[in-house]
């Protein structure tokens, strides 16, 4: 339960910035009709080949278990996004690289006791292949504007998470995972966006050779997205 509360609390803090932006974005000109009202639709849906983007990012993974014992690993994020309307889109992605968690017991992922913590550090690699449903709240509330500087995009994700041993450790596990996230798109040019993505992941505690329970991870990445 502590993991779930931590997960929800972290996302709530990330979401504060999301709700401070729409009022400002709505004041921008260029997305208003002849009466000065913000245009929020309806929109013509685009063709399959329109409004795609590819992105790559790097950052950190913060894994935790029910006791708030956390450890940091490196994160790599690669994704492809398709916007169906200005406010609704889908994304397929790979997230992963390295992870670590503290455990009270020795497992296949960690057998050396850390005397300062009286715990065993579990080190592993992981790959999370996921599908996301995106909602651009800036366009949904403030109306579509191509030149908007900052877009706030909450999303839900689900997918397959594979964990494997590092440094010769013999371990592999596959689990269902899901969660919520907040994507910030900052416009650099017509074709290029700076991205800041905060993602919470929930999965089974077995993923790091622990028996049962719920495990969580908070992933934060900074990267670039190219609009095709």
Where are these regions (language model features)?
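Residues that define the transmembrane beta-barrel architecture of outer-membrane proteins
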Residues: 50, 70-76, 123-129, 150, ...
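Short loop/turn motifs that connect adjacent beta-strands in outer-membrane beta-barrel proteins
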Residues: 40-51, 86-87, 139-152, 188-191
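Cleavable N-terminal export/targeting peptides
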Residues: 1-45, 228
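Predominantly the C-terminal beta-signal and adjacent terminal strand-loop region
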Residues: 90-94, 101-113, 117-119, 124, ...
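Membrane-spanning beta-strand positions in outer-membrane beta-barrel proteins
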Residues: 53, 89, 151-153, 179, ...
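Short glycine/proline- and aromatic-enriched beta-strand/turn motifs that initiate or cap beta-hairpins
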Residues: 24-82
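Residues on the lipid-exposed face of transmembrane beta-strands in outer-membrane beta-barrel proteins
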Residues: 56-60, 76-82, 94, 131-137, ...
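Gram-negative (and chloroplast) outer-membrane scaffold detector with strong preference
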Residues: 87-176
């Amino acid at each position: 339960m502590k993991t779930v509360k931590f997960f929800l609390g972290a996302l709530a803090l990330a979401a504060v910035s999301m709700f401070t932006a729409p009022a400002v974005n709505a004041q921008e000109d260029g997305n208003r009709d002849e009466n000065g009202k913000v245009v929020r639709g309806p929109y013509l849906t685009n063709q399959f080949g329109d409004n795609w983007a590819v992105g790559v990012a790097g950052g950190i993974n913060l894994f935790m278990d029910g006791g708030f014992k956390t450890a940091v690993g490196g994160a790599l994020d690669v994704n492809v996004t398709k916007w169906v309307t200005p406010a609704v889109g889908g994304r397929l992605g790979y997230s992963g690289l390295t992870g670590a968690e503290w455990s009270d017991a020795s497992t296949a992922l960690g057998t050396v006791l850390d005397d300062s913590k009286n715990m065993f550090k579990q080190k592993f690699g992981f790959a999370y292949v996921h599908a996301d449903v995106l909602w651009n709240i800036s366009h949904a509330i403030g109306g579509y504007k191509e030149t908007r500087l900052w877009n706030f995009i909450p999303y839900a994700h689900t997918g397959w998470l594979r964990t494997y041993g590092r440094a010769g450790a013999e371990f592999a596990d596959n689990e269902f995972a899901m969660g919520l996230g907040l994507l910030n798109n900052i416009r650099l040019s017509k074709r290029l966006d700076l991205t800041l993505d905060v993602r919470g992941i929930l999965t089974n505690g077995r993923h790091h050779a622990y028996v049962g329970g719920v495990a969580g991870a908070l992933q934060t990445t900074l990267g670039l997205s190219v609009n095709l």
